[in-house]
């Protein structure tokens, strides 16, 4: 269910601010979004997997916190990230 090493490296490369940047909010939100999208496919096949659903809700909440932080720091970066990831808000 987790992202492959290649998928994760590609996401980090696409969203990093500088070489070696893995901790910026953009990278973290992009990784969480990819994990969330992957888990949503899992729940279509396994609707009764409540244990994993708890993890999904935790990821969604963490993404929301990071987006709120980014919105408070720099609205233009927040808007660009929302548009790039296709999130509603």
Swiss-Prot record:
CDD domains: Ribosomal_S15p_S13e. GO terms for biological process: translation. One of the primary rRNA binding proteins, it binds directly to 16S rRNA where it helps nucleate assembly of the platform of the 30S subunit by binding and bridging several RNA helices of the 16S rRNA. InterPro entries: Ribosomal_uS15 (IPR000589), Ribosomal_uS15_bac-type (IPR005290), uS15_NS1_RNA-bd_sf (IPR009068). Part of the 30S ribosomal subunit. Forms a bridge to the 50S subunit in the 70S ribosome, contacting the 23S rRNA. Keywords: Ribonucleoprotein, Ribosomal protein, RNA-binding, rRNA-binding. It comes from Pseudomonas fluorescens (strain Pf0-1). SMART domains: Ribosomal_S15. PROSITE patterns: RIBOSOMAL_S15. NCBIfam families: S15_bact. GO terms for molecular function: rRNA binding; structural constituent of ribosome. Belongs to the universal ribosomal protein uS15 family. This is Small ribosomal subunit protein uS15. One of its GO terms (cellular component) is cytosolic small ribosomal subunit. Gene3D superfamilies: 6.10.250.3130, S15/NS1, RNA-binding (1.10.287.10).
